[in-house]
């Protein structure tokens, strides 16, 4: 996928072979590497997701989803009924060290909250307390929650 942002802001997220492009403002032109097809033009509140097999249909995001997608620009991470395993992965994008969730049952529990990126250790403490989880702090900023 090739993308060109003339002006505005886009959230780009790459995880393995998956890419997600969300147009926050302005417009974004996206072209496939596969061929000379006309580019897709994303407007604000539109998201395109693609993987090695191609892209899925463009989706229009509601205000809540846009708030979550743009939270990083305000220095925040935002969770709404997010499984703790996914919340930990998002926290790990911004925090030095690693937050590791031990146990599938704990990882499936959901978390809701708005946390400052520069204070993610506070977020971990709140999550630990809210779930009555045990935390083990290891060197290098590694935290094991069980």
Describe each model-derived feature in a short phrase:
Residues 1-146:
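A residue-level detector for the "anchor" residue at the start of short, highly conserved motifs
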């Amino acid at each position: 996928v090739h993308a060109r942002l003339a002006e505005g802001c886009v959230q780009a997220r790459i995880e393995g072979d998956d890419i997600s492009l969300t147009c926050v403002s302005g417009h974004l032109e996206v072209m496939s590497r596969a061929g000379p097809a006309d580019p897709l033009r994303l407007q604000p509140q539109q998201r395109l997701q693609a993987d090695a097999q191609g892209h899925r249909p463009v989706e229009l995001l509601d205000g809540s989803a846009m708030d979550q997608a743009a939270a990083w620009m305000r220095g925040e991470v935002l969770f709404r009924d997010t499984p703790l395993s996914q919340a930990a992965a998002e926290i790990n994008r911004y925090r030095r060290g690693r937050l590791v969730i031990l146990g599938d049952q704990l990882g499936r529990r959901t978390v809701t909250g708005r946390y400052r990126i520069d204070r993610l250790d506070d977020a971990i403490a709140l999550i630990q307390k809210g779930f009555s989880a045990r935390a083990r702090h290891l060197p290098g900023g590694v935290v094991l929650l069980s």
